[in-house]
């Protein structure tokens, strides 16, 4: 069984035969329900892009857990320089395998920077763990190539999609993404953390209709796959 726990904003904890964090922004995250110290035994940390609300505590958690950080090559180098001794796996768009976990880094239409200077490119991740397929979109606008993700790696058991607008897709665009991705279940994320990304997950649910099962997780809640 694979559990997908929502940690607030875009942070998720995936637990199966491996323990995986994605975008662990905990410190300073108004929605956070966990602290970096809660993840001393995590195996992998996936970072979708360099913005602070995604890199978050990745470096610190890697230090206390010995977890490997998987990210775009340039972002991995940036983290390795900031957090000496942390093990990183720098990759680019494409498939790879890290510690027996199949990971595809896929494009995302978004920027990636330290807030000022560009670092690498933004991405999403498709993770196959214990026979389950999880897609974390990162921060992105909707794009037609999302069709390829289900075509090449599907069926997608759960898609984690931003719905907050302003920096990413809003509810309308995310509902279109569901049409392209054809996931079994979709979990909205990256909304209501701050006023500019206010969104109503019930409106998203209505727009998705019967195209997928929408599970609205509160920070701290989890989904079993
Ligand atoms: Ni971002
Ligand atoms: Mn973001």
UniProtKB/Swiss-Prot annotation:
GO terms for molecular function: hydrolase activity. InterPro entries: Metallo-B-lactamas (IPR001279), RibonucZ/Hydroxyglut_hydro (IPR036866), UPF0173 (IPR022877), UPF0173_UPF0282_UlaG_hydrolase (IPR050114). It comes from the Archaea. Pfam families: Lactamase_B_3. Keywords: Hydrolase. The keyword Hydrolase applies. The keyword Hydrolase applies. SUPFAM superfamilies: Metallo-hydrolase/oxidoreductase. Belongs to the UPF0173 family. HAMAP family: UPF0173. This is UPF0173 metal-dependent hydrolase PYRAB05000. It comes from Pyrococcus abyssi (strain GE5 / Orsay).
